[in-house]
Swiss-Prot record:
Gene assigned in the entry: frr
Gene Ontology CC entries for this record: cytoplasm
Family to which this protein belongs: Belongs to the RRF family.
Organism superkingdom: Bacteria
Source organism of the structure: Microcystis aeruginosa (strain NIES-843 / IAM M-2473)
Protein name: Ribosome-recycling factor
Length: 182
């Protein structure tokens, strides 16, 4: 396993954590809140964003304009059943989601959720590190690389691990500030 591959895997983990953070509601309208919603459409699970145009006309509203008006009921149902905690209102052409201000208790819950997602990302990075170091030690035992090369590679993997974990911690700090800002 090459160092570049390890860093690439770690970067993908950071990006995945960032996407997970984007789905956490902060009190401001953000179309990415609906990224994980799938709609039962003609018997198939279809992502909401492929069935409608999603926009944020103001800081507290998300507007969803379905390409096919017959899908409005299914979209409303999917949003109601999802974990976003928003109630859709339908005017016949557009589905609107009003984002209520977050209570302090809800903000604390969201900070805990963000911390949990960050921890999952850090665990994934540590697992990548463990796999990489195991592969390096295996190559050393097989006499493919020297003990010094093995130690150098392990140090590089550890430095990469520290760097990517710090990135996740920075993302978490930013998200926590975002959530706690009224």
């Amino acid at each position: 396993m090459k160092l570049a591959e390890v860093q690439d895997q770690m970067q993908k983990t950071v990006e995945s954590t960032q996407r997970a953070f984007n789905t956490i509601r902060t009190g401001r309208a953000n179309a990415s809140l609906l990224d994980r919603i799938v709609v039962e459409y003609y018997g198939m699970e279809t992502p909401l964003k492929s069935l409608a145009t999603i926009s944020t006309p103001d800081a507290t509203t998300i507007a969803i304009q379905p390409f096919d008006r017959t899908s409005m009921g299914a979209i409303e149902k999917a949003i109601s059943l999802s974990d976003v905690g928003l109630t859709p209102s339908n005017d016949g052409q557009t589905i609107r989601l009003n984002i209520p201000p977050l209570t302090s208790d809800r903000r604390k819950e969201l900070v805990k959720l963000a911390a949990k997602l960050a921890e999952e990302g850090k665990v994934a990075i540590r697992n990548i590190r463990r796999d990489a170091i195991d592969a390096i030690r295996k190559r050393e035992k097989g006499h493919e690389i020297s003990e010094d090369e093995s130690r150098d590679l392990q140090d590089q993997v550890q430095k990469s691990t520290d760097k990517f974990i710090a990135k996740i911690e920075d993302l978490l700090t930013t998200k926590e500030k975002d959530i706690m800002t009224v």
